[in-house]
Design a protein with these regions (language model features):
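Aromatic-rich peripheral "rim/lid" segments of glycoside hydrolase catalytic domains that contact
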Residues: 120, 124-128, 138, 149, ...
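Noncatalytic carbohydrate-binding groove/subsite architecture in carbohydrate-active enzymes
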Residues: 1-129, 133
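Surface-exposed, glycine/proline- and aromatic-rich loop segments on solvent-exposed faces
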Residues: 231-350, 412-438
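Ser/Thr/Pro-rich, low-complexity mucin-like regions
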Residues: 262-264, 338, 344-348, 353-357, ...
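Short, well-ordered beta-strand segments enriched in hydrophobic/aromatic residues
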Residues: 215, 250-259, 390-398
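Charged, glycine/proline-rich intrinsically disordered loops and linkers
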Residues: 11-51, 176-193, 321-360
Length: 512
C-alpha cells in the first residue's frame, strides 16, 4: 500500500526541507530547522512499472491510504482547489482524479480514508474536512461525501477507516504530551484525532453511570459537592450555591450551581491549580482578586459564544512565531501574581513556501474556546448552562489541563535544565470559583471557598484497567446507506436487520 507522500505525481506547492530552506534564504529569512516533518514530495513510487504475466491472471491494482487533509499539497494545490463534483468544491476529488488518471487501466483502491470525530484538530482542510474537530454527525456526513468523491474519481474501491475508536493511537500534535506514551491505551484523549476515527465509539466510563452535558443533576447523584454555600438560596445571578467535580477516563467534569444564569449581570471564573499550591498565578484575571493557591488554568465563563479555558503564560505549550508552532520550553508552571492569562492557540498547519515560490500562511485556532451545547445536540459539547435550574456543567479533556496520563495522575512538568517534556505525579487539583459583574469586574461578587478559607485538594483514583463502553456512531448507518446507494443495491436496512434479526456488533465490555 502506498500513500500520497510517495505517489508518482509532482506537486508544485510541496517543497522539500532543502528546497524550502533555499527559498527562505532567497528572502533573507531563516527557516526554523526544528520543524519535524516528512519530505512529502521527494520520491515517488509508481505501481505502473509492474504488470501481471499470464501466470497471474488476477492482475494488479494500486492501493493508497489517502485522506483529504494531508500532506499539505492536498489542501494547497491550486488545481485541486478548482476541482468540484455536482455536490460542490472538493480538493480531495481533484487529487484523486489526477491519481486515478495517472494509473490508466490499472485499478486504484483507496484502502484508507475518513475523518475522526475528535475535539482536537490536527490539520485544516479548505472544505472543512479537517483532521479532527468534527462531531459524530459531521463525521458521518463527511465520510459519506468522501466516499462519493472516491467513486466519482473512477477509483475501483474504497475502505473506510476505521471500525472502532483506538485509544492506543497517537497524533503528531499531541504525542509529546501523552506521557508515558505506553500508557495512552489506558485513557481516551479527545484532543487526539488519531484515536477517534471509528464508526463505533469507545466511550470512557461505565455505560450506566456515564456523564452527559445536559444541565441536569441526575448523573451527579452520589457526588458530594466540593463546596456548598451557607447562604440562603436566591435568584441572584452572582450567587454561588455549590461546586462539584467528577472524572472518567476521558474528561474532568465540573458542575457549578448559581442563583440564576444571566450573563449580562454575572460571569464566572474557575481557577484550577493542577500541581503545587505555590506554583502558578496567584491572581484571577479581570477582577484582580488574590488567591492563596496558584492557578495554571482559569475557566472564563462569559456566555455561550465567548467562554474559554485560559492558561498561565509560562505553562502555555506553544508560542506561534512567524507561522511556526514553537514549544514554550521548559513546560513548567512558575510562581507569579500578574493575573495575565493566554488563550490556548495551536497551529495545525504551519507556514510553508511552495516550489512555486508562493507563501502559504499558517492556520491556527484557539483550542481553549468552549462549545456551548447539549451533548445530545453535538458530541463536541464542552459545557452547558441551564437557565431554568441554574446548573452549569463543563467537561474538559484531560489534555486541555496538561494531564499527560490521568491513569497515573501525571501532569506536565518539564525538565528545567534540558527543557524537555517530563511529567510528575500530582496529588490532585484545587479549585477556586468567583462570580463577578461584567459591568464592574472589580466590584462585588461571591467566591467559593471564601478568601480566608483553606482550599481543599480534590483527587481521583489511579487505574491500570480502564472502564469503557461501546456505542454506534451515526457513521455506521450512514455508511451502510452510502455504500448500498453507490453499488445500486436495495436501500440498506436499519441498524437492526428485521429479516435476519442480526444487530451491529456488540463488543465485550469490562465487567464491573
Amino acid at each position: 500500500t502506498n500513500w500520497p507522500t510517495l505517489d508518482p505525481l509532482t506537486h508544485i506547492t510541496e517543497s522539500t526541507k532543502q528546497e524550502e530552506a533555499a527559498l527562505y534564504a532567497l528572502r533573507g529569512e531563516k527557516r526554523d530547522t526544528s520543524v519535524r516533518e516528512y519530505d512529502n514530495d521527494a520520491i515517488g513510487l509508481d505501481a505502473k512499472i509492474m504488470s501481471a504475466t499470464s501466470a497471474f491472471p488476477a492482475g494488479l491494482f494500486a492501493s493508497y491510504h489517502a485522506y483529504p487533509y494531508y500532506p499539505d499539497f492536498m489542501v494547497l494545490d491550486p488545481d485541486y482547489n478548482k476541482a468540484s463534483t455536482p455536490e460542490g468544491p472538493s480538493a480531495y476529488y481533484g487529487y484523486l482524479k489526477e491519481l486515478v488518471d495517472h494509473h490508466g487501466d490499472m485499478p486504484v483502491v483507496i484502502s484508507e480514508y475518513g475523518v475522526p470525530s475528535s475535539r482536537g484538530m490536527a490539520h485544516w482542510q479548505p472544505q472543512g474536512w479537517h483532521h479532527g474537530g468534527h462531531d459524530e454527525r459531521a463525521q458521518a456526513d463527511i465520510d459519506a461525501r468522501l466516499t462519493r468523491d472516491i467513486h466519482a474519481s473512477g477509483a475501483a474501491g474504497a475502505v473506510l477507516f476505521a471500525a472502532i475508536d483506538e485509544w492506543f493511537k497517537k497524533n503528531w500534535l499531541v504525542i509529546d504530551f501523552e506521557n508515558p506514551l505506553e500508557r495512552n491505551r489506558l485513557w481516551l484523549n479527545p484532543l487526539d484525532a488519531e484515536q477517534n476515527y471509528g464508526i463505533i465509539a469507545m466511550r470512557a466510563g461505565v455505560r450506566d453511570s456515564a456523564m452527559s452535558i445536559d444541565g441536569r443533576a441526575n448523573d451527579w447523584r452520589g457526588a458530594k459537592a466540593l463546596y456548598s454555600s451557607a447562604a440562603q438560596p436566591s435568584n441572584e445571578p452572582l450567587q454561588l450555591r455549590s461546586f462539584s467535580v467528577r472524572s472518567d477516563e476521558a474528561y474532568l467534569y465540573l458542575r457549578l450551581d448559581v442563583g440564576r444564569v444571566d450573563w449580562t449581570r454575572a460571569n464566572y471564573l474557575i481557577g484550577i491549580d493542577t500541581y503545587r499550591r505555590d506554583l502558578g498565578d496567584m491572581r484571577f484575571p479581570y477582577t484582580g482578586a488574590a488567591s492563596n493557591v496558584g492557578f495554571e488554568f482559569v475557566l472564563d465563563l462569559r456566555g455561550p459564544a465567548n467562554s474559554r479555558l485560559l492558561v498561565d503564560p509560562p505553562y502555555n505549550l506553544y508560542r506561534i512565531v512567524d507561522g511556526y508552532r514553537i514549544y514554550n520550553r521548559p513546560f513548567r508552571s512558575q510562581p507569579n501574581e500578574d493575573g495575565q492569562y493566554d488563550s490556548i492557540r495551536v497551529a495545525p498547519n504551519r507556514r510553508r513556501i511552495g516550489r512555486n515560490n508562493v507563501d502559504y500562511p499558517a492556520y491556527t485556532y484557539d483550542r481553549g474556546l468552549l462549545v456551548h451545547a447539549l451533548q445530545s445536540q453535538t458530541t463536541l459539547a464542552d459545557w452547558y448552562a441551564d437557565s431554568t435550574s441554574g446548573i452549569i456543567e463543563i467537561r474538559l479533556a484531560w489534555g486541555m489541563l496538561h494531564v499527560t496520563d490521568p491513569s497515573s495522575r501525571t501532569v506536565l512538568h518539564g525538565d528545567a535544565e534540558t527543557g524537555e517534556v517530563a511529567g510528575v505525579e500530582t496529588d490532585g487539583f484545587r479549585f477556586v470559583v468567583q462570580s463577578f459583574d461584567p459591568r464592574t469586574p472589580r466590584g462585588s461578587g461571591e467566591r467559593l471557598p471564601n478568601a480566608e478559607a483553606a482550599v481543599p485538594t480534590w483527587t481521583w483514583q489511579m487505574w491500570e484497567e480502564p472502564r469503557w463502553h461501546a456505542e454506534i456512531k451515526p457513521a455506521f448507518e450512514t455508511m451502510r446507506q452510502t455504500f448500498a446507494e453507490l453499488l445500486g443495491l436495495p436501500a440498506a436496512v436499519e441498524a437492526t436487520d428485521q429479516r435476519s434479526g442480526t444487530r451491529p456488533p456488540r463488543l465485550r465490555e469490562p465487567k464491573r
